[in-house]
């Protein structure tokens, strides 16, 4: 998260927790016409998977946070507040969140290039807490990426495991009588030979 997003997350986290929810992270996206402040919320880990985030949860957080932002005023200028569940392609904001998703695949965008690349996709292998880094399996190699160099990260859903993978098309079966393809004929519709 950016410094501004971290500042806002620290400010709003107690409010979200007071509603029995968890603030996973904040995206602050400044733009000329007005910024977007996006909050990702979830139910506490202990309550998953029995309980999931719903629209009512997002509305409650939006109301409470909106009131707090009006008083605290951490953002100058106009902005749009969005409150969202993380979805199946959830963003990852903290080392703890990377640890929760060990074994899953993630897409990562770096702040500074590493090995000539800024974008990686690989399986989260482990967290190196001492080095404050995440170790990924990328293209058959272990790649250690410093947490401070990660700009954005998202889980890549396993659509097959979720039962949402597109089905392969059925192989064509035998043709029904009367539905065979007609061979091009040298005759016109009237049965007369065509002039060539």
Swiss-Prot record:
It is found in: Cytoplasm. It comes from the Bacteria. Its main location: cytoplasm. GO terms for cellular component: cytosol. InterPro entries: Ribosome_maturation_RimP, RimP_C, RimP_C_sf, RimP_N, RimP_N_sf. Pfam families: DUF150_C, RimP_N. Keywords: Cytoplasm, Ribosome biogenesis. Residues 173-182 have a biased composition (Basic residues). Residues 164-196 are annotated as: Disordered. One of its GO terms (biological process) is ribosomal small subunit assembly. PANTHER family: RIBOSOME MATURATION FACTOR RIMP. Required for maturation of 30S ribosomal subunits. Belongs to the RimP family. HAMAP family: RimP. This is Ribosome maturation factor RimP. It comes from Xanthomonas axonopodis pv. citri (strain 306). The lineage of its organism: Bacteria, Pseudomonadati, Pseudomonadota, Gammaproteobacteria, Lysobacterales. The gene is rimP.
